[in-house]
Amino acid sequence: MLPINNNFSLPQNSFYNTISGTYADYFSAWDKWEKQALPGEERDEAVSRLKECLINNSDELRLDRLNLSSLPDNLPAQITLLNVSYNQLTNLPELPVTLKKLYSASNKLSELPVLPPALESLQVQHNELENLPALPDSLLTMNISYNEIVSLPSLPLALKNLRATRNFLTELPAFSEGNNPVVREYFFDRNQISHIPESILNLRNECSIHISDNPLSSHALQALQRLTSSPDYHGPRIYFSMSDGQQNTLHRPLADAVTAWFPENKQSDVSQIWHAFEHEEHANTFSAFLDRLSDTVSARNTSGFREQVAAWLEKLSASAELRQQSFAVAADATESCEDRVALTWNNLRKTLLVHQASEGLFDNDTGALLSLGREMFRLEILEDIARDKVRTLHFVDEIEVYLAFQTMLAEKLQLSTAVKEMRFYGVSGVTANDLRTAEAMVRSREENEFTDWFSLWGPWHAVLKRTEADRWALAEEQKYEMLENEYPQRVADRLKASGLSGDADAEREAGAQVMRETEQQIYRQLTDEVLALRLSENGSQLHHS
């Protein structure tokens, strides 16, 4: 940092000639502001940066993370970027007309000053804003998430990206597009929006609107689904959810939520065990998840479901690692609709089985381990298929798409971890033809890719380390010999062939590819060897439908 000196000799150029008369005024005002610092404020550091910015004619001023409660009224007039995020600011002074980027996230702002006419980026998330001033026509990106905003001003035609998640918006702004070629992505998730204006259809089909977790009426949902399903539809892609946006944030004690799944004669002992986990990370959201799980169609209609959940909870109580993993998986499950809870339950059952495999449950049952691996492989392929399907839909709840493929193909693909019923299949956009195509694709890819996938699967490696220590050690030795002797030349050859020699990013990518190919070769050879031995002993088969 340059030394600050009030006797600094100003160069003879146009800028400094302009400010020479006010140079002392800036310093005097800033020094006075510094002396008014509250305990904990780093105003001395802020003033040092202000003076350096002025002396150097810098176009950027960064005063973030200094615990400031206010800013001086006279900011350097030449700046184009101002970063004052992560302070304690309740208001901002008049902003320089030259400003193009304003970062003031995570403060306590209740209002904003008049915005500069050339502003391009406004980042004021995590404040206490209730409204916004008029937005300049130049604005390209804006993040106002996590505020208390009830309505929005007119949106500039230039605006490409808007994030307004978690506010109190009751309606969307009017959308006008015309011949404007801008590709837009707007996020209005988790507000209080109950209807969608017809002007949303003015947006181009390359645009995306996110309105998940809002109390949209069933009439609004049906109307949108009807419009966006039309062959003539050319409007934006709309991401929604079947959630009403009104999930209860209250939760009961974890032990109470757990014991509700057990018979009365076991509840006292179970409660005592789970009381010890009340303060673990995500315990509160896990409690809420268990209560929501009890209200799913699977819980109501599936025989033995309560016993299945109770047995799973017993396993969680006995393993801190599994419990930690499961709490994390369930962390966001209650922020959306019932089918989000059902999909999370699927993922929790996968987590349990993979954990058990890694811990040795299938060390002596290779056939069962192969069956589990095959199920995990099929689920991965279904996720790929669901992801591709989402891209084709104009009005989409992603949760419903992912769950639809798992639920509707659970029996045909022998998916033991998938629920057999879901509530909102009708809005998923997944057709009978989609399901037939997905089943065929899963079986085709399984036939051609499963053994390679299985040879790289973490739980299989854990089994090999425990039960085939000598073979595993030999495979590791072969891998590192190959990497030491062949890796550099193979990477160099790949870069030369693509004309990217000397490109650091390309070298990293090529290195990762060579590493994966090496591991694939070594571990596939080891897998074939071990499976041939084990499957011949017990009569199991590697391939089956």
UniProtKB/Swiss-Prot annotation:
Ordered alphabetically, the record's keywords are: Host cytoplasm, Host nucleus, Leucine-rich repeat, Plasmid, Repeat, Secreted, Transferase, Ubl conjugation, Ubl conjugation pathway, Virulence
Would you kindly state one Gene Ontology biological process term found in this protein's UniProt entry?
protein K48-linked ubiquitination
Q: What is known of its domains?
A: The LRR (leucine-rich repeat) repeats are involved in substrate recognition with target proteins.
Q: Which reaction does it catalyse?
A: S-ubiquitinyl-[E2 ubiquitin-conjugating enzyme]-L-cysteine + [acceptor protein]-L-lysine = [E2 ubiquitin-conjugating enzyme]-L-cysteine + N(6)-ubiquitinyl-[acceptor protein]-L-lysine
Q: Where are the LRR repeats?
A: 57-77, 78-99, 100-117, 118-139, 140-157, 158-179, 182-203, 205-228
**Function (record text):** Effector E3 ubiquitin ligase that interferes with host's ubiquitination pathway and modulates the acute inflammatory responses, thus facilitating bacterial colonization within the host cell. Interacts with IKBKG (NEMO) and TNIP1 (ABIN-1), a ubiquitin-binding adapter protein, which results in TNIP1-dependent 'Lys-27'-linked polyubiquitination of IKBKG. Consequently, polyubiquitinated IKBKG undergoes proteasome-dependent degradation, which perturbs NF-kappa-B activation during bacterial infection. Mediates polyubiquitination of host U2AF1, leading to its proteasomal degradation.
Q: What is its main location?
A: secreted
Protein name according to UniProt: E3 ubiquitin-protein ligase ipaH9.8
Q: Which organism is it from?
A: Shigella boydii serotype 4 (strain Sb227)
| Active-site residue list | 337
Chain intervals for the UniProt region annotation (E3 ubiquitin-protein ligase catalytic domain): 251-545
Please state every residue range assigned to the domain named NEL.
253-545
